[in-house]
Amino acid sequence: LVPRAIEVRGVKVKVEQIDIPVSYAAAFEGERVRREDMHVQFGGKYSRAFELVKTAEGEITDGQVQLVGPDIDSVKAGEAMDLGVVVEVSGRKMQSDFEGILERQIHRYLNHAMGVMHTGQRHQVWTRISKATFAAGFRLRHFGTILHAKFHEDYGQIVDKVQVTIYTRPADIEKLLPQALARYDARDARMSGMTDESVNTFYSCTICQSYAPNHCCVITPERLG
């Protein structure tokens, strides 16, 4: 009843504190986890891994995080596991064009957790969790906790519900990875057909100002920056 009332009235969820057993801050972005300090890793050249954000096709439960398969306490330190992170989102203003934008934020959100190293996106990700972070009690479900909180915090205007399912069984990855690749290809095909003349909005990016203070990129369909 309460979730339905929140949805009908348009009440926005805000998570005041992310419930994970390690510190969480932007200061940890770019932290490297070396092999000798690593408990487990996913993707890269060591295993299969992918991340996918998609608009929910049916009813979802906000805040639900489900792990399908073994957790990271089932492997010995230094081993690799398959990983699939599927984030389903819904909202009155949510559009399929936003999926790729939200998906790219997974890199930043996971990197802000102490002892978590994340690079890449889509099916070209590489993630490591340190021994210290594992010893503190960090588990795969905490990936979902982070994503739920941050999507609501940063994209609350378009996202009403966030549900995360994490897969680690090789059989599930074998089945789901081709589906994810098909979605990536569909997005790329849609983008490749766009031209500067076909849109009425261009965007600017100032991320480079961290090392080039006078720099600003103008982003268009034919000029990506």
Segments (PLM) and residue ranges:
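Cysteine-centered metal-binding/redox modules
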Residues: 1-225
